[in-house]
Design a protein with these regions (language model features):
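Phosphate-binding P-loop
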Residues: 1-5
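Short hydrophobic/aromatic beta-strand immediately N-terminal to the Walker A/P-loop
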Residues: 7-9
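Residues at the beta-strand->loop junction immediately N-terminal to the Walker
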Residues: 11, 131
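The conserved Walker
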Residues: 14
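Post-Walker A alpha-helix
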Residues: 21-22
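Conserved nucleotide-sensing/catalytic segment adjacent to the nucleotide-binding pocket
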Residues: 34-40, 44-106
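C-terminal accessory "lid"/substrate-recognition subdomains
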Residues: 114-123, 127, 144, 158-297
């Protein structure tokens, strides 16, 4: 944690909706003139797509049906913590990109499912923004969460998360339902041990809850819409959160606990704008003071 070089971390499982959250933050950064270094969590996988598929096949032949992208053996946890620590201390570090699809790959002139070369973060960034699977991960040897100034969890109820993953992987990646279900089953031990515990270390959690029947996510024809859901927003430290203001600004919102506000699904982006803009500006003001710069006009 560093006033001079703040870090915002958004963490969530595959299919949780972290990418949509990132788009909202990018909009805030543009509006406020903030230079953010965006870090894609997938770039800290240890193996590229082809290598990982080969490892999964080899593990299956040896009777291991639980090798996944969620656990420490297939990720660069130490390097991720080193990035967070180093950026907090100096505002610098090394990053790379993971090329998810053919469009990304074409821009970089290499195959999809591979990594770009490591590059140094420019010297003029205002903050680091991480979005991925492990933004609050902690093991016996690493603790990424402790380096983040603002840590956000995006965690739909699990049936909804599975519906979103099924639809994304089938529509955008061409997988069959059976292949996606196999992936969900294979990842379950690492999901329980490395993904779920992160949401107890976050500062704010967003949990989308559908109001339609999702009892069997594997036969769902549609992803429940925003209007068919609520978003449960939990604050780990509610002191300083202006709940009366949020309730007045977000129609049909209500509080279910002293540290939880519930908003209609269609108001999630508005809620994020109202909640995080003041937090980001506070981080930027602290950065200016630490650097001896004048305050915002």
């Amino acid at each position: 944690v560093s006033a001079s070089h703040p870090i915002i971390s958004v963490t969530g499982s595959s299919g949780a909706g972290t990418t949509a959250v990132t788009h909202t933050f990018q909009w805030i950064f543009r509006r406020e003139g903030i230079r953010a270094q965006i870090v894609d969590g997938d770039s800290f996988h240890r193996f590229n797509r082809g290598e990982m598929q080969a490892r999964i096949a080899e593990a299956a032949r040896e009777g291991d049906d639980h090798l996944s992208h969620f656990g420490p053996e297939n990720n660069l946890f130490a390097e991720l913590e080193a990035l967070f620590r180093g950026y907090g201390e100096t505002g610098r570090g090394r990053v790379r990109k993971y090329l998810h699809n053919d469009e990304d790959a074409a821009r970089h002139g290499q195959p999809a499912g591979t990594f770009t070369e490591w590059e140094e973060i420019p010297a003029d960034t205002d903050l680091l923004f991480y979005e991925g699977l492990h933004g609050a991960v902690a093991t016996d040897t690493v603790d990424v969460a402790r380096h983040a100034d603002l840590c956000i969890g995006v965690v739909p109820i699990i049936n909804l998360e599975w519906i979103q993953k099924l639809h994304r992987d089938k529509v955008t990646r061409g997988y069959s339902t059976e292949a996606v279900v196999d992936t969900i089953l294979r990842r379950m031990p690492d999901y329980v041990n490395y993904i779920v515990p992160q949401f107890s270390r976050t500062h704010v959690n967003f949990q989308r809850v559908p109001t339609v029947d999702t009892s069997n996510p594997f036969i769902a024809r549609y992803i429940p819409s925003a209007d068919e859901s609520f978003v449960v927003i939990r604050f780990a430290r509610p002191k300083g959160i202006d709940f009366p203001y949020l309730l007045s600004m977000i129609h049909n919102s209500f509080m279910s606990r002293p540290n939880i506000i519930v908003v209609p699904g269609g108001k999630m982006e508005l809620a994020m704008q109202l909640i995080f803009t003041p937090m980001i500006l506070k981080l930027m003001d602290a950065r200016r003071r630490a650097l001896g710069a004048p305050p915002r006009p």
